[in-house]
Amino acid sequence: MRWQGSSRRKATGGKVITARGKRKFEMGRESAETRISEIKRKKVPTMGGNRKVRLLQSNVANVTNPKDGKTVTAPIETVIDNTANKHYVRRNILTKGSVIRTSMGTARVTSRPGQDGVVNAVLIE
């Protein structure tokens, strides 16, 4: 689990004396690490009774051509580049900003698959 509360260190490097401990709502969750395979989603309860859809696996993306504004569902072939982590390329993990090869051409992922539950991408030259 990840802790998403404030740091115990000040900007100067000194320790902050906290008046309380950690709280459960400050805990994070493990990342979804969406892979290229048959579509698999998972619904996760969030604060306020809401839900978040995690995309665990996907083999299609909604690819938009910026020249004509048309959006087409295209199969994903592979991950070409990922600025989030260089090891995600060989593991074919999709994150926002990753460059993928589709049947329409090379595209950059614009959605957050682990939080949105869908892969949206824009064609790049």
Swiss-Prot record:
Pfam families: Ribosomal_S8e (PF01201). PROSITE patterns: RIBOSOMAL_S8E. One of its GO terms (biological process) is maturation of SSU-rRNA from tricistronic rRNA transcript (SSU-rRNA, 5.8S rRNA, LSU-rRNA). Keywords: Ribonucleoprotein, Ribosomal protein. Gene3D superfamilies: 2.40.10.310. Signal peptide: none annotated. GO terms for cellular component: cytosolic small ribosomal subunit. GO terms for molecular function: structural constituent of ribosome. The keyword Plastid does not apply. Part of the 30S ribosomal subunit. Belongs to the eukaryotic ribosomal protein eS8 family. PANTHER family: 40S RIBOSOMAL PROTEIN S8. This is Small ribosomal subunit protein eS8. It comes from Methanosarcina acetivorans (strain ATCC 35395 / DSM 2834 / JCM 12185 / C2A).
